[in-house]
Amino acid sequence: VEVLYWNRDRKEENLNRYDSRIRFHEFSDYMQDSAPYARKLFHFYRYRSQALKLLKTGGFDFVIVLHTLPGILVSDYLLKNFAGRYIFDYRDSSFEHISFFGKRVMQLSLASKLTFVSSDAFRRFLPSSGVPVITSHNILEDSLNHRDDRIHAFKASPKIRIAFWGFIRHADHNKKIIDRLGKDSRFELHYYGRKQAVAKQLETYAKTNGADNVFFHGEYNPEDRYRFACCTDIIHNSYWDNNTRFAMGNKYYDSVIFRIPQLTMPGTYMGERCTAKGTGIALNPDSSDYADSIWEWFKSLDRIQFEKNCDADLDAILLEYNAGKDMLNNLFNAQAK
């Protein structure tokens, strides 16, 4: 097995934790996540060059394409040389509204052996027939081993602590949330994630506006989420742009695994799903009663019913997740024969 990965932070990676039979190929090229797409084009071109070189010289029997954009960047070569011999893992929507991009996504899916989607809302961009499309959830399996940590180590607070963890982006949307919740003594708003441009901008914005109940904690490791869960009352899972409207983010799963209510945005797939499943609420920070609505909803929450809802949603998610794993195992076992 050979893996090409993009080290966008140019930080040293601890590869010793992986199986020694895996050979890693590093593409080291610094690029900020929040950089404009026009500025990213040069980096994409360099990545394409390295990926093509590996595909042409590796003698591979099968390819797994993780995420949409890497697949698009080498789509011409995949369609010509690996049709029926690759898995297309579709995890982000971006430029599907552009005719060429949308058609190429369709072609990549149709020529794949299997296509996986991380959100059922992404199916609108894929063919409705011709290739199996399987829902593959972004669950970190180790999280399941820590599901009850919060029961034993929960730290209560008189304030409602709303926490975001992950890649901090969408400055304007988060400024609205800070405007609504900052300086409101009923709440604390916590951000965990790398302090790149948007995070620094939001931190400065909160300080400038005297929102001393808004905190930025910086970079963290995945396992730190178990600690965050023990001091969080609501997960901030609110996004708003065309690329995230249809996504199922990691925090959705953290919400149902750790049984923490989630705050989402109306008009998003996660907002629709969490309200339908009874695991969260969808509210728009443009609303003047945003803070009051959060307070009233949280204080009236039926905790017993909420936890049952989380358990039921997690059971449904794991059923699909394990079915996808079984399908992969069957495919690779057949390839090995």
Regions found by a protein language model. Name each.
Residues 1-42, 194-197:
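N-terminal strand-loop element at the rim of the active site
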Residues 285-291, 298-336:
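A charged, aromatic-enriched C-terminal amphipathic alpha-helix characteristic of glycosyltransferases
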Residues 95, 110-157:
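Donor nucleotide-sugar binding/catalytic pocket of nucleotide-sugar-dependent glycosyltransferases
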Residues 116, 152-172, 177-179, 189-190:
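Conserved donor-binding/catalytic core segment of Leloir-type glycosyltransferases
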Residues 65-71:
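Short His-centered aromatic/hydrophobic patch
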Residues 190-193, 200-227:
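Nucleotide-activated donor-binding/catalytic signature segment of Leloir-type glycosyltransferases, i.e.
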Residues 45-56, 72-73, 77, 81, ...:
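Membrane-proximal helix-turn-helix segments that form the acceptor-binding/catalytic region
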Residues 172, 223-230, 235-257, 263-272:
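Nucleotide-sugar-dependent
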